[in-house]
């Protein structure tokens, strides 16, 4: 029974240690000023494209679908750059 209590205490300390950086980051994001363009106040998307990573064959872009994802691209996609949306960095995946 004592071992179970010790393991539970270690688990709670580990969870609390991980939660503190998340709370600090959430506070930083909330404190950051909104980056909203005057002409389009709803959405601001900034893309950084690395041309050296782009597909070389013109036909290969025909059916390419790209998305901004957090935290990383899913299986079968490749990261081609970075998106900035609502002050957060997203992976630009195709």
Swiss-Prot record:
InterPro entries: Alpha-defensin, Alpha-defensin_C, Alpha-defensin_N, Beta/alpha-defensin_C
Xref: SMART domains: Defensin_propep, DEFSN
Disulfide bonds, paired cysteine numbers: 66-94, 68-83, 73-93
Sequence positions bearing Phosphotyrosine: 85
Residue list for modification ADP-ribosylarginine: 78, 88
Principal localisation: secreted
UniProt propeptide residues: 20-38
Lineage: superkingdom: Eukaryota
UniProt keyword list: ADP-ribosylation, Antibiotic, Antimicrobial, Antiviral defense, Defensin, Disulfide bond, Fungicide, Host-virus interaction, Phosphoprotein, Secreted, Signal
Alphabetical list of Pfam families matching this protein: Defensin_1 (PF00323), Defensin_propep (PF00879)
GO biological process, one term: innate immune response in mucosa
Modification comment: ADP-ribosylation drastically reduces cytotoxic and antibacterial activities, and enhances IL8 production. Phosphorylation at Tyr-85 has been found in some cancer cell lines, and interferes with ADP-ribosylation.
Cellular compartment(s): Secreted
MF (Gene Ontology): pore-forming activity
Cellular component terms (Gene Ontology): azurophil granule lumen; collagen-containing extracellular matrix; extracellular exosome; extracellular region; extracellular space; Golgi lumen
Signal peptide segment: 1-19
Function: Effector molecule of the innate immune system that acts via antibiotic-like properties against a broad array of infectious agents including bacteria, fungi, and viruses or by promoting the activation and maturation of some APCs. Interacts with the essential precursor of cell wall synthesis lipid II to inhibit bacterial cell wall synthesis. Inhibits adenovirus infection via inhibition of viral disassembly at the vertex region, thereby restricting the release of internal capsid protein pVI, which is required for endosomal membrane penetration during cell entry.
Similarity comment: Belongs to the alpha-defensin family.
Subunit field text: Tetramer. Dimer. Interacts with RETN. (Microbial infection) Interacts with HIV-1 surface protein gp120.
Protein name (database record): Neutrophil defensin 1
Organism of origin: Homo sapiens
Organism placement in taxonomy: Eukaryota, Metazoa, Chordata, Craniata, Vertebrata
Gene expressing this chain: DEFA1
């Amino acid at each position: 029974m004592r071992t179970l209590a010790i393991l539970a205490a270690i688990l709670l300390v580990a969870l609390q240690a991980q939660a503190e950086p998340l709370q600090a980051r959430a506070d930083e994001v909330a404190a950051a000023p909104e980056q909203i363009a005057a002409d389009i106040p709803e959405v601001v998307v900034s893309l950084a494209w690395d041309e050296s990573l782009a597909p070389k064959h013109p036909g290969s872009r025909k059916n390419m679908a790209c998305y901004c994802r957090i935290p990383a691209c899913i299986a079968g996609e490749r990261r081609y750059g970075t998106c900035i949306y609502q002050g957060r960095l997203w992976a630009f995946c195709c």
